[in-house]
């Protein structure tokens, strides 16, 4: 398929989501305090608080660890916390964790803010962004808001980034390439060896953002290796991570980028005035230290994901193999109808994605939530079974 060039007007017309907002649903889930679990609600749904089950956010369904919630409680009780000092301590801890220098690290209020910083730094007037379709859209939205051209390349039949097609669109005007790996919304991987070959062929003036928001959920894939854990030391590569997903800290919005010092400096030059809340810094430090919770969450997610596949198979429903905590499920009918059906039963699903008109993306919830999901699925005409 040919690449799609998107103008700002086109994107605003096609994107029914609007601007994502964040809310919080505190709950006790299987003995784990989920105070940090938050669900994006968009457009008209932002005003609707009547969805007890919201399978939209791709956050840890079980919330942050007890160690993290204890750190947050202690921070809230503290009489004085210096935001800059706490942010510096977090930066030091992340740098130590990844064995990088402080000057190679940029910490900000969420990975989405880092993506906006990258656009501001590397998409100067006349420069173009190349991205996949579908993929996480924040970076495209911000680029179009600055009247930058966005070239959107459909995924391959295997749902990987079509790196050959992306490369064919790269020239001296390409300022930035965005790769979400694993990809959102498909949950699929683009092999590491292919990405390395792709980066090596990029124009010297083109930078690439590799978004590893779902890195921790990858479960033993032989063709996946993180560009933070196994860096290639290419000065054009920027790797982003977030504490919002497996760590369950979406409410607190902390993300970070790893890049060569000069590139990190260019990102820092476009930092917005908002700082990082000191309570959020304390929470992120506790999450970073709680490696056992991350390990247990990965294992639990793998079990929950396999159970989702099993339930889908029992209903002869097709799905896209995922390496994340969400799954694209073929509803065998217009996705808009499926979303409306679930909303009528007080379950919130994301709006449909272009080129996937019969698929719904389902964030994995708790076992009780997923049991209700499948019950409501069975209430669709035909019992939700494929024909």
Tell me the role of every PLM-derived stretch.
Residues 155-157, 302, 311-345:
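Conserved PLP-binding catalytic core of the aspartate aminotransferase-like
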Residues 121-179:
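PLP-dependent aminotransferase-like
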Residues 18, 22-81, 96, 168:
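N-terminal "arm"/small-domain region of PLP-dependent enzymes with the aminotransferase-like
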Residues 236-313, 317-320:
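PLP-dependent aminotransferase class I/II
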Residues 1-20:
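N-terminal secretory signal peptides and thylakoid transit peptides that target proteins
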Residues 344-345, 349, 353-387:
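PLP-dependent enzyme catalytic core of the Aspartate aminotransferase-like
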Residues 163-170, 185-208, 212-246:
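Active-site pre-lysine segment of PLP-dependent enzymes
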Residues 79, 89-128, 142, 146:
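Phosphate-binding glycine-rich loop
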């Amino acid at each position: 398929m040919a690449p799609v060039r998107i103008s700002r007007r086109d994107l605003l017309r096609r994107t029914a989501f609007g601007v994502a907002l964040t809310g919080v649903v505190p709950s006790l889930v299987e003995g784990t305090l989920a105070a940090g679990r938050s669900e994006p609600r968009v457009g008209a749904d932002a005003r609707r608080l009547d969805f007890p089950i919201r399978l939209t956010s791709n956050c840890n369904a079980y919330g942050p660890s007890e160690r993290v919630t204890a750190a947050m409680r202690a921070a809230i009780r503290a009489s004085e916390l210096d935001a800059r000092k706490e942010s510096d301590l977090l930066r030091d801890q992340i740098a130590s964790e990844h064995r990088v220098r402080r000057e190679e690290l940029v910490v900000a209020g969420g990975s989405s803010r880092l993506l906006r910083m990258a656009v501001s730094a590397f998409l100067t007037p006349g420069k173009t962004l190349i991205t996949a379709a579908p993929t996480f859209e924040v970076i495209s939205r911000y680029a179009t808001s600055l009247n930058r051209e966005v070239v959107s390349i459909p995924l391959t039949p295997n749902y990987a980034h079509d790196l050959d097609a992306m490369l064919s669109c790269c020239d001296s005007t390409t300022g930035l390439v965005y790769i979400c790996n694993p990809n959102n919304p498909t949950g699929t991987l683009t092999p590491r060896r292919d990405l390395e070959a792709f980066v090596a062929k990029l124009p010297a003036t083109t930078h690439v953002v590799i978004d590893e928001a779902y890195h921790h959920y990858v479960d033993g894939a032989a063709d996946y290796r993180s560009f933070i854990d196994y860096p290639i030391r290419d000065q054009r590569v920027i790797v982003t991570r977030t504490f919002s997903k497996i760590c369950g800290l979406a409410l607190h919005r902390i993300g970070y980028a790893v890049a060569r010092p000069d590139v990190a400096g260019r990102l820092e030059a476009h930092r917005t005035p908002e700082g990082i809340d000191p309570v959020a810094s304390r929470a992120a430090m506790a999450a970073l230290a709680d490696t056992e919770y991350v390990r247990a969450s990965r294992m639990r997610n793998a079990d929950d994901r396999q159970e989702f596949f099993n339930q889908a198979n029992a209903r002869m429903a097709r799905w896209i193999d995922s390496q994340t905590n969400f799954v694209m499920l073929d509803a065998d009918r217009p996705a808009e109808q499926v979303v409306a059906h679930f909303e009528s039963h007080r379950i919130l699903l994301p709006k449909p994605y272009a080129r996937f008109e019969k698929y719904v993306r389902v964030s994995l919830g708790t076992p009780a939530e997923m049991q209700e999901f499948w019950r409501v699925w069975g209430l669709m005409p035909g019992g939700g079974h494929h024909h």
